[in-house]
Design a protein with these regions (language model features):
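Nucleotide-sugar donor-binding catalytic core of glycosyltransferases
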Residues: 1-247
Length: 248
């Protein structure tokens, strides 16, 4: 069994069941674990916005969720099939072979218990900065997204996309030389649904992308998965250990 500790931050008091701040890396890594290990992966407290049934039940408002939820919401099924009961005691009794902290700098729930168990521990840090929380390194393997300097017990990690989202065949008659969406130009952020957003890249030869706060970004992968070529500005300045698995 694998325990995946997720991060949630409550929005305003009028929407107590909605979590505005998600974590792309944590959410998509959870999806990858579930693809590999199925319901042996227990997400706690539970990333409900990833589940089609639960997101519909809670009437998720995509207008106030990061990136309108494109690519990373509604990618799992059967939220209630996962047994999330008595997690604390299960950690104490070494029920889990592995405990993954999906966003360690936002949530270290049960860590005081986990470090005294026999479970292996993985920490994931998807923040945009290059800071590493070194106090965790003695307890497990630390995966850092914006990674620039070799550090003991730290490994690089990339963002990802669900395989089901990858375009099966490329449009051989694209309309645009360069995709209309220009990162940082708010007036080009006109896409209200995932389908139209994807079609914009599918109908384009190149998609402009570049470093904003951090080097790694969902946009790079959304361009690629829709059969479009990333026109990545200043890619030569990207640290070797950041986006290590992305051809650059």
């Amino acid at each position: 069994k694998i325990l995946f500790i997720t991060f949630h931050k409550k929005d305003d008091e009028n929407q107590p069941n909605f979590y505005r701040f998600t974590d792309y890396l944590g959410d998509l890594t959870l999806h990858g674990f579930r693809e590999l290990y199925g319901e042996d992966v227990i997400d706690f407290p539970g990333s409900w916005h990833l589940y089609k049934d639960e997101a519909e039940k809670r009437k998720i408002n995509k207008d106030i969720i990061w990136g309108r939820g494109f690519t990373y919401t509604n990618i799992l099924d059967n939220f209630d099939n996962i047994n999330r009961e008595d997690i604390k005691n299960k950690i104490k009794s070494n029920y889990f072979e592995l405990i993954v902290y999906g966003s360690i700098r936002r949530s270290d729930l049960f860590l005081d218990i986990a470090v005294n168990s026999k479970s292996k521990i993985i920490f994931i840090d998807g923040h945009d900065d290059t800071y590493i929380e070194k106090k965790f390194l003695k307890h497990g393997l630390y995966f850092k997204r914006e990674y620039f300097e070799t550090t003991k017990n730290v490994e690089p990690i990339n963002l990802s996309v669900p395989k089901s989202k990858i375009l099966k065949s490329i449009d051989i008659k694209p309309i645009h030389l360069v995709a209309p969406l220009i990162p940082g130009k708010s007036k080009t952020y006109i896409y209200k649904n995932e389908e139209d957003y994807y079609k914009m890249y599918q109908k384009s030869i190149f998609g402009i992308t570049y470093k904003k706060t951090g080097w790694d970004c969902m946009r790079h992968y959304e361009i690629l998965m829709n059969g479009c070529l990333p026109l990545f500005l200043d890619i030569e300045n990207c640290p070797d250990l950041t986006m290590k698995n992305l051809p650059k």
